[in-house]
Amino acid sequence: MNYIPTQTFYGRRWRPRPAFRPWQVPMQPTPTMVTPMLQAPDLQAQQMQQLISAVSALTTKQNVKAPKGQRKQKQQKPKEKKEKQKKKPTXKKKQQQKPKPQAKKKKPGRRERMCMKIENDCIFEVKLDGKVTGYACLVGDKVMKPAHVKGTIDNPDLAKLTYKKSSKYDLECAQIPVHMKSDASKYTHEKPEGHYNWHHGAVQYSXGRFTIPTGAGKPGDSGRPIFDNKGRVVAIVLGGANEGARTALSVVTWTKDMVTRVTPEGTEEWSAALMMCILANTSFPCSSPPCYPCCYEKQPEQTLRMLEDNVNRPGYYELLEASMTCRNRSRHRRSVIEHFNVYKATRPYLAXCADCGDGYFCYSPVAIEKIRDEASDGMLKIQVSAQIGLDKAGTHAHTKMRYMAGHDVQESKRDSLRVYTSAACSIHGTMGHFIVAHCPPGDYLKXSFEDANSHVKACKVQYKHDPLPVGREKFVVRPHFGVELPCTSYQLTTAPTDEEIDMHTPPDIPDRTLLSQTAGNVKITAGGRTIRYNCTCGRDNVGTTSTDKTINTCKIDQCHAAVTSHDKWXFTSPFVPRADQTARKGKVHVPFPLTNVTCRVPLARAPDVTYGKKEVTLRLHPDHPTXFSYRSLGAVPHPYEEWVDKFSERIIPVTEEGIEYQWGNNPPVRLWAQLTTEGKPHGWPHEIIQYYYGLYPAATIAAVSGASLMALLTLAATCCMLATARRKCLTPYALTPGAVVPLTLGLLXCAPRANAASFAETMAYLWDENKTLFWMEXXXXXXALALLACCIKSLICCCKPFSFLVLLSLGASAKAYEHTATIPNVVGFPYKAHIERNXFSPMTLQLEVVXXSLEPTLNLEYITCEYKTVVPSPFIKCCGTSECSSKEQPDYQCKVYTGVYPFMWGGAYCFCDSENTQLSEAYVDRSDVCKHDHALAYKAHTASLKATIRISYGTINQTTEAFVNGEHAVNVGGSKFIFGPISTAWSPFDNKIVVYKDDVYNQDFPPYGSGQPGRFGDIQSRTVESKDLYANTALKLSRPSPGVVHVPYTQTPSGFKYWLKEKGSSLNTKAPFGCKIKTNPVRAMDCAVGSIPVSMDIPDSAFTRVVDAPAVTDLSCQVAVCTHSSDFGXVATLSYKTDKPGKCAVHSHSNVATLQEATVDVKEDGKVTVHFSXXSASPAFKVSVCDAKTTCTAACEPPKDHIVPYGASHNNQVFPDMSGTAMTWVQRMASGLGGLALIAVVVLVLVTCITMRR
């Protein structure tokens, strides 16, 4: 069957009904049935009917407020008759005539009233044996009932329908009868995040989950619908999962094309099943014991035995409540006093305490059983043997506490109760055996009170209390102002909880004082108690008595007497033996449950920040030890963390990739470095060198050193070549006696005076004799140098390399093809492409990643948490032996010790000296805190990337979500886009990860069933409630000390608590590429790594035809200001002419610059200003506006701010970029040096050639 209902409606029954009319309304005649094809709907009649209904409702409201008139008095009696006659019709009419709720109940709010009004027709109760177990809902054209709800629908028409069951959706579905279609509700698949309505108030919808405050829903609500503000059904409730302060709902809901079922982890079905208990092989509802009016007050011992027989049944607590309150079948309101009712069936006890405050052993009435410190806010829950909030009769008394004094229960003032560690603790709550208190750090814990005789009774145990801080600051006093962080605390409520303690029938208490010796006989003084005695003198001196009894011819040493009482329970303490080996027990709720709350923590003083060049200096002023950490946002995070407890100064290196630091509980701060420097890229050579030295010191030193070396080598080579040429010219004349050196050669080779005229004489001779030769001789060298310089300059201009480092846009090509592109996987970095299509005006496409989520596929191996050691009361077999039996408990240990001789406060527990045995047991279980504080061990597999991408083209500007896998297609404005797969298959998660609260750790944990004591995974289970618990804690039982009833044992401390102290930094603080690690589900957000290929199909309708677009001419560009390596730090003015105003796409066709604008509004003969970002000091890039193109040339200056809180919108440079001015100076230097070298080469070649001809 299709589980998507059809939206078919004939009217809405949940609209405001017509108000009651106090006057008689005549019956309207039944209209004649007309075939719908022949009868058109009369719109005017419908409008008139609506108007009449509105006027009637308004008139009724006025009549209600009017004083009683004659007409109203006349109609009062007929009204009563009419109501009496209307009490019989169908169930639907009964529902309309329901009496108003009792005044005691809380008035429902607006949401509840709205839902009740809608639910009045569209939901029906499902009943089993007369009890409501859930609901069925009419949605669209179908009736839907949760499959797990047992029973039949309380409507004869719906009950006889044939339902089809779907185990996948946990639904049973059938077609609604035609006559009931008007009662159905609409449904919708539209679910924007926000608040919705249901029977119990508001439902919050966020991140695909419906949640409610814990306690707002309960078993029996299965099948209830959730409505939006228009009264449409958005989901049907199936159950819930308790997550602390809120409960996540398990629902069936609809998407656009299908039905989905959302089932949070730990979901429980909310069907109100009927709980059954047993009594003498007879079943009965647990809430209604068959022995009415019997209850605990009338038959205490029989009632306790009945409870022990049903202790493991689901309805045990209903049976316990019914037995203790002795209520009749009508349900009473619960109160705080009723929470204490169960304690009337229990009693305090005396237990062994190793240190009763004075360093000596005693049997203390306030013995400390357990100290629980699971609350992260430092609160302790202490269990003692006394009972607080009760008087000695067992009734609730907030100012009293009761304790055991011998065989009797006494009471004292609660105000005398004290708890100490290194100083007095602050007690916040008490109930029964439990105390909740805040204590200062210490190495022991002591509880004490003053008894009825003003004597101090105490017990002291060794316990190290050193609570871990909440957050990142170790504060002592809770601040007035701060920030709220999630934490756990013991909720100060005495209401029943999921936690429980075991109770058992107490043993017989030996008391030697009951025996007295009189004239060779032993007298047993009962004193109104039941005494079990055993005397070895004579025969048949064994039994019980409630009256005084005398044993003739006997001695006290031959008798053993003990008080027996089985009409009360006592806590199953390892310091008190149990009555029998079968360990019959009961259970009692534990107050003050651990719950998720928020704790106010301080905010560290903001540090003094000084920004420097590629570094930031923080001056930290901690008021208490405060955590300071930082990491790089690049591929190698280099995490650093420390606790600072005094004034400190820290210098953090900041790179262009960015860093993130966090001080205390302040939010993390991200900073990026900019390419700031001294000097100017367009100044004199020393300013240019200073500029590049600030950016690239090593490269600048290398370049300047290389250039200087080349210049020196060039000059040296020039001088060497000229000297060689001179030597070759003069050598022949030097070897020939009387030879005369020619004038020209003498001038070129600087011949000696003896062989040639001086330069002045030669030049004077040429001036007198031949002036033409004089000018040719003087200008020859200058002409050669000028010619050489021109040649070198032309050569350099032709071969001038483009800037080594251009703006790469993180690997994205500026010119995208029509159907493919590659965008950077960097949040906030815009990718732009210019798309041209014949007959259409060019269009700019902009793609920008808004958010990215990398979610691994996880397989939960197990959960681990803190364990608790369960030590049942030991069983002591007097004058006999006992045997251990195997039990299905984790890490179960059992041993029998012979030859024990235990004592209790009243004397020896056993009559025999050496034939006694003690059976000691212990096993491991999950601590009660595991529901709130546990770690999950996962195996992580292939991660899938889901990205939120903003797509802009033409008039479309839309954000969409897509899976980056190369298959998932999204439609935006009629265009189809397919993203992925991503270029880099990278994930910050290892194969094994551990999730603890909101932190994720890469950790190699042991597999299931292989845990080691004291290490992570010493206890393991699939869920926090599953029965497959594995434990390995090195639990070993020890022999009890002589004369003491106790169960000593040794055990390795919790591996989970050890792991919490040694776990180190989480992946949240050291993930590379700036990833933000989140949980629920586990994912890495906004990782700046890799590129995303995009395939797209853009229809022609997205383009503007050429004839419709403005024709732009005379386009020119003038850069007003330019700051390179800054986020859109340059401004350019485009001047143009156009034939008509309109919108034009503007785009940069070069990778050197990225424009901020995608489209501009053009006007006739106007100008437009655009912003661009460039990493080059001398960018030159082509810009197009519609079909016109021009070139923008700029001379950019370096940025002024060293550090900024945002990343640049361009790629950082890897190789130094040469400015135009720097290239000009290089050309000039190269021309000069090259000219000198070329002259030297020419001279040397000529001289060599002439010499070789001789």
From Swiss-Prot:
Residues covered by the Peptidase S3 domain: 122-270
Location of the region described as Interaction with host Mxra8 receptor in the Swiss-Prot/TrEMBL record: 360-363, 396-398, 518-521, 550-556
Annotated site location: Cleavage: W270, S271, R334, S335, A756, A757, A816, Y817
Region (Ribosome-binding): 108-122
Residue positions of motif Nuclear localization signal: 70-108
GO molecular function: RNA binding; serine-type endopeptidase activity; structural molecule activity
Region: Transient transmembrane before p62-6K protein processing, residue numbers: 729-749
Record-listed E.C. numbers: 3.4.21.90
Disulphide connectivity of cysteines: C122-C137, C277-C286, C291-C295, C294-C326, C353-C459, C356-C362, C425-C439, C487-C599, C535-C559, C537-C554, C729-C750, C865-C930, C878-C910, C879-C912, C884-C894, C1075-C1087, C1117-C1192, C1122-C1196, C1144-C1186
InterPro entries, per database record: Alpha_E1_glycop (IPR002548), Alpha_E2_glycop (IPR000936), Alpha_E3_glycop (IPR002533), Alphavir_E2_A (IPR042304), Alphavir_E2_B (IPR042305), Alphavir_E2_C (IPR042306), Flavivir/Alphavir_Ig-like_sf (IPR000336), Glycoprot_cen/dimer_sf (IPR036253)
Region spans: E1 fusion peptide loop: 900-917
Lipoprotein in keyword set: yes
Composition skew (Basic residues), residue ranges: 84-110
Residue stretches spanning the membrane: 695-715, 772-792, 794-814, 1232-1252
Sequence segments annotated as region (Host transcription inhibition): 43-77
GO CC annotations, alphabetized: host cell cytoplasm; host cell nucleus; host cell plasma membrane; membrane; T=4 icosahedral viral capsid; virion membrane
Lipid attachment, kind S-palmitoyl cysteine: C719, C729, C750, C1249
Region (Functions as an uncleaved signal peptide for the precursor of protein E3/E2): 271-282
Segments on the Cytoplasmic side according to the record's topology features: 716-756, 793, 1253-1254
S-stearoyl cysteine-type lipidated residues: C1249
Catalytic residues in the record: H148, D170, S222
Source domain of life: Viruses
Extra facts: Belongs to the Old World alphaviruses that usually cause fever, maculopapular rash, arthralgia and myalgia. Structural polyprotein: Translated from a subgenomic RNA synthesized during togavirus replication.
Record's comment describing the protein's domains: Structural polyprotein: As soon as the capsid protein has been autocleaved, an internal uncleaved signal peptide directs the remaining polyprotein to the endoplasmic reticulum.
Protein name from the UniProt record: Structural polyprotein
